[in-house]
Structure formats: structure tokens, C-alpha cells
């Protein structure tokens, strides 16, 4: 047993040596999280995700299931001030609004307990999960176009154009599905360990355009298609999907002493490489080309939780999450 414990300790220390890319991890994988977000020492069925080693202390043997759905809606606003923006709408300050919608964010936890063993699984949306749409595009998109009248005026040495107009839109979605399987074993009556893996499948999509770009002439305010003035500038369209797979090893420990329970879970880094499936890319940006590959690692996560039963109907809990990002 000492050898097994030593190997577990070494594996936990490895968490500190794992580094990765952007942070995109959902930890609210059961509706119990909405009641109490400190689930790192749970011994209920949601522990299949939050504290899998704690499943050793399920109150009865046999199968246990939990099927959940959550919905999320969010508005993201950007207010940007940039002098050339005044060429379209006569205001240098512009407001861009994006609406995020996710009607279905499912998760399923299941466990089968027999003696000292518990076999468990979790399927959930471990990253992303919604669609975000900016109906008027983004400020970074429009900023490029807003500079064209000034640039043309400088080249011709006259105030030939006083503004611009365009149509812009961006819609994107990012979903990471995770399927987790693992085994929990009661090493002692009050001490258990878990070993498992999660297969992560990433599916991102992006659709957007900049089109109908026109320049406003100083002569009567007539709008002229930009290509008549700057042939190298035209409509830009983007339609692509990115997919990738990665596997994350997961280990966990749980210790129970009287009314106190402590759980520790470590998810190692998930190395993922996304591959583009591009239907259209006229942006001139090579990172959107078909078959282009992008690193998309999910960072390692160390979760520590504790809960104490003050009374049979009163429990206090606390948790700590550290992403090695």
C-alpha cells in the first residue's frame, strides 16, 4: 500500500508541472452546484465529476444516476471610442452588443457501487456550451474599415471622402464535450482513491462577414463602393468549423474523519490540436484556412474541497480550484 500511496503523491506533484493554453473549463456540472458551488468534497452522485474518490462513501450499493440540464443567457457589451468611427453614424463612440444563448447544457453522472469498488462515469459540456452573436460585428472589424477614408484622402492630397458605411456580423460557438470513466477504491474504511480518464471533443464554429463597404464622397455625400476606389478591399466572409480530440488523466483522493470529509482531485493537462474545416475564407488571414491546425490545450486543474456536518441537516463546505494556466 505504501508503494501505491507514493505513486499517487508523485502524480499529484505532477500537476504543478503542467501548463497549457487558454482557460475554458466549466465546473458547474450538476444542478447541486447552483445550491452550493463548493462541491469538492461531495460524497453524493455529483462527485462523479467534482470528487470521484468520494463516491466510495455513497450511502448504498448498486446503481445511482443523475440527469441534469441547465440553460444560460448572457449579454456582452463593448463600448469603444475611436475617432474614425465618426465617419459612420457621426459618433466616435460606438456600442457593440453580443448575445450568448445556451438553452441546453446537459450533464449525466452515473455510478455503480459494489463492496470497496465504485465504477463511475460523467458526460457533460466541460467547456463553452453556447452561441454568441454580435449582430453588428466587432469594433476591431469596423476599425480597419473606418481608416480607409483618411488613408485615401492622404494619398490623393484632398478631402475626397468624409465617411463610410458597411454591414458586419459575427456568430460563433464553442463546445467541449467530455466523457469521463473511472474507478474508485476504498483503501481503508475512511480513505479512498480514484483513477480515471476523460475524452474531450472540441467543436467550434465561426461565421461572419464584412460586406457592402462604401465610402461617402465629399461631393454631395454620394456613397461609392469601396472597390471602385481601393480595388484591393472588398467583401470579407468567414465560415469555418474547428474540431479536435484530447484525453485527460484524472486522479483523486478522499479522506473521511468523523464528520469531516476532505477531497482532492487533479485533472492533468489535455493536449488538443484543432483542425479547421473551412467552407469560406476571404479575410486574407491564413489561420482561418482549411486544414490549419491550432493548439487548444485545456489546463490542468487541482481541486481541494472540505465539508463538515455540524448537524444531520446542516453542513458547511469550502473549496479551492487552481488552474495551471
Give, region by region, the residue ranges found by the protein language model.
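Outer-membrane beta-barrel porins/channels
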Residues: 21-38, 42-43, 103-107, 111-325
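N-terminal, post-signal peptide beta-strand-biased segments of exported outer-membrane/organellar beta-barrel
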Residues: 16-128
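Residue-level detector of transmembrane insertion/anchoring sites
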Residues: 6-7, 41
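A ubiquitous, low-specificity "background" feature that marks scattered single residues
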Residues: 8-10, 57, 195, 324
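Positively charged n-region of N-terminal signal peptides that target proteins for export
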Residues: 1-4
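Bacterial N-terminal signal peptides
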Residues: 7-17
Amino acid at each position: 500500500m505504501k508503494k501505491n500511496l507514493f505513486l499517487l503523491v508523485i502524480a499529484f506533484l505532477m500537476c504543478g508541472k503542467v501548463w497549457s493554453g487558454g482557460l475554458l473549463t466549466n465546473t458547474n456540472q450538476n444542478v447541486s452546484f447552483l445550491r452550493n458551488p463548493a462541491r469538492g468534497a461531495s460524497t453524493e452522485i455529483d462527485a462523479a465529476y467534482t470528487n470521484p474518490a468520494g463516491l466510495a462513501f455513497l450511502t448504498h450499493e448498486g446503481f445511482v444516476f443523475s440527469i441534469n440540464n441547465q440553460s444560460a443567457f448572457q449579454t456582452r457589451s463593448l463600448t469603444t471610442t475611436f475617432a474614425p468611427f465618426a465617419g459612420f453614424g457621426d459618433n466616435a463612440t460606438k456600442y457593440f452588443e453580443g448575445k450568448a444563448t445556451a438553452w441546453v447544457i446537459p450533464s449525466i453522472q452515473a455510478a455503480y457501487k459494489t463492496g470497496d469498488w465504485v465504477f463511475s462515469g460523467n458526460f457533460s459540456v466541460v467547456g463553452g456550451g453556447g452561441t454568441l452573436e454580435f449582430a453588428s460585428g466587432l469594433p476591431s472589424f469596423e476599425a480597419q474599415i473606418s481608416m480607409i477614408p483618411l488613408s485615401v484622402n492622404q494619398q490623393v492630397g484632398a478631402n475626397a471622402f468624409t465617411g463610410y458605411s458597411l454591414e458586419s456580423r459575427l456568430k460563433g460557438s464553442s463546445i467541449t464535450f467530455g466523457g469521463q470513466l473511472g474507478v474508485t477504491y476504498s483503501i481503508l474504511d475512511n480513505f479512498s482513491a480514484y483513477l480515471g480518464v476523460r475524452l474531450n471533443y472540441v467543436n467550434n464554429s465561426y461565421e461572419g462577414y464584412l460586406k457592402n463597404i462604401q465610402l461617402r464622397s465629399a461631393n454631395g455625400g454620394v456613397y461609392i463602393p469601396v472597390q471602385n476606389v481601393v480595388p484591393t478591399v472588398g467583401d470579407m466572409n468567414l465560415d469555418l468549423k474547428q474540431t479536435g480530440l484530447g484525453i485527460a488523466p484524472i486522479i483523486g483522493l478522499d479522506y473521511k474523519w468523523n464528520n469531516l470529509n476532505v477531497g482532492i482531485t487533479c485533472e492533468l493537462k489535455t493536449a488538443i490540436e484543432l483542425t479547421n474545416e473551412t467552407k469560406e475564407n476571404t479575410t486574407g488571414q491564413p489561420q482561418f484556412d482549411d486544414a490549419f491546425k491550432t493548439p487548444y490545450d485545456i489546463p490542468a486543474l487541482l481541486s481541494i474541497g472540505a465539508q463538515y456536518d455540524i448537524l444531520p441537516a446542516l453542513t458547511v463546505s469550502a473549496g479551492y480550484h487552481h488552474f495551471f494556466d
